[in-house]
Amino acid sequence: MIITRVSFLIFISLLSVCHIPQTETSNKTTIVTGADQVNRYLPLLKGKRVGMLVNQTSIIGDKLSVDSLRSLGVQIVAIFGPEHGFRANASNGAVVKDEINPETGIPIISLYGKKRKPSKEDMAKLDVMIFDVADVGCRFYTNINTLADVMEACAENDKPLIIFDRPNPNGFVDGPVLDMNLKSGIGKFPIPITHGMTIGEFAQMVNGEGWLPNKMKCNITVIKLKNYAHDMDYTLPVHPSPNLNTQQSVLLYPSLCLFEGTIISQGRGTHMPFTVLGAPALKGKY
């Protein structure tokens, strides 16, 4: 069946408005992220060797949280990077190598390369771990899997985990729950496609549902958001990954990413990723 230009545009338009929250934040008190509440967690870091799972979205104000905490005297001994790397300069699914930060000498350990969770040797160098990465609230966006892997490493090595909570731009629940017979690296938990939770809430669910191996519990402290509601229209201040470079792409991602199971491209590698669809087999102009 040939898809007409009009029907295609209607399809994209419907996806664009589907589940976009109606509550505006312009007249509300500014959302305060977990990372911004320095006075709440700084005492927990005093005199401790700190590891941080962070990337380009990990900011306090307009400064990277790593730099902000170092300026406050926090002893950061290791940085861990998720998919796309600490600087978000790796493509989706690409292996990211370990490196040393040339300015600080702090090791940057990839959790999207040879290993997916911190090793026992990594954890032995830490007293506490921080997780501070923005998420887009989608089951197959790998940050929640990395969070669970970090929780597992902390539980195995009896190390506390502090989570700086951040808003979910897709703060609604939709889509089928994962069939666990189809469990994979991009789908590890029985949750819907869009789960509606913040990263801190998801961590609490992992603990509460006993989803870590052998039903281990991770000692987590969530620095909760202030002035946040799940139905708020929220735009991430920093693009979460190379191919989610606009608010529209973030909102369309849970729907358009499903086309990765077909011959249809979602615009990766173009200047409009996750806002267009196309394939050589499609006839006509769009």
Region annotations inferred by a language model:
Residues 1-28:
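Bacterial Sec-dependent N-terminal signal peptides
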Residues 88-93, 162-183:
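Glycine-rich, charge-decorated loop segments at or immediately adjacent to ligand/cofactor-binding or catalytic sites
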Residues 248-286:
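Internal helical hairpin/lid segments
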Residues 183-254:
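Conserved anion/nucleotide-ligand pocket segment
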Residues 75-84, 164:
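Short internal beta-strands
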Residues 135-147:
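Glycine/threonine-rich flexible loop motifs
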Residues 27, 84-105:
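N-terminal beta-loop-helix "entrance" segment that forms/cooperates
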Residues 97-126, 138:
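Glycine-rich oxoanion-binding loops at beta->alpha junctions
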